[in-house]
From Swiss-Prot:
One of its GO terms (molecular function) is large ribosomal subunit rRNA binding. One of its GO terms (cellular component) is cytosolic large ribosomal subunit. HAMAP family: Ribosomal_uL11 (MF_00736). Belongs to the universal ribosomal protein uL11 family. GO terms for biological process: translation. Disulfide bonds: none annotated. One or more lysine residues are methylated. The gene is rplK. InterPro entries: Ribosomal_uL11 (IPR000911), Ribosomal_uL11_bac-typ (IPR006519), Ribosomal_uL11_C (IPR020783), Ribosomal_uL11_C_sf (IPR036769), Ribosomal_uL11_N (IPR020784), Ribosomal_uL11_N_sf (IPR036796). This is Large ribosomal subunit protein uL11.
């Protein structure tokens, strides 16, 4: 018989830097999960990624207080900011442009995020990433 699901917890945790402090501790503590066990497992799974990169994670908590988790790819906005070398997007994206990304960088980001994105082809995924870039005040160069 399958385990009974108690809750799903969605968090963004820095790769390789999960610790019991907020937001991880309170979110998992409410569900009765062993927080240190999650932190060790998450850090082990994300050790190959760049340290500090925010990684979305969905934690499935079961009625017997055990858990499983699925890590996703970093948000497109974070990858775009890293590619453009900027700290934050524009407050007025249509007026103030804050940086540039090339089509090759957009393709690379789309390929990185391919597993977590909808869209039939890499081109449709690239259009989605390019739209995110424009909404952040980045210019997409061909």
């Amino acid at each position: 018989m399958a385990k009974k699901v108690q809750a799903y917890v969605k968090l963004q945790v820095a790769a390789g830097m999960a610790n019991p402090s907020p937001p991880v501790g309170p979110a998992l503590g409410q569900q009765g999960v062993n927080i240190m066990e999650f932190c060790k497992a998450f850090n082990a799974r994300t050790e190959s990624l760049e340290k500090g990169l925010p990684i979305p994670v969905v934690i499935t908590v079961y009625a017997d207080r055990s858990f499983t988790f699925v890590t996703k790819t970093p948000p497109a906005a974070v990858l775009l900011k890293k590619a453009a070398g900027i700290k934050s997007g524009s407050g007025k994206p249509n007026k103030d442009k804050v940086g540039k990304v090339t089509l090759d960088q957009v393709r690379q980001i789309a390929e990185t995020k391919a597993a977590d994105m909808t869209g039939a082809t890499i081109e449709t995924k690239m259009k989605s990433i390019a739209g995110t870039a424009r909404s952040m005040g980045l210019v997409v160069e061909e």
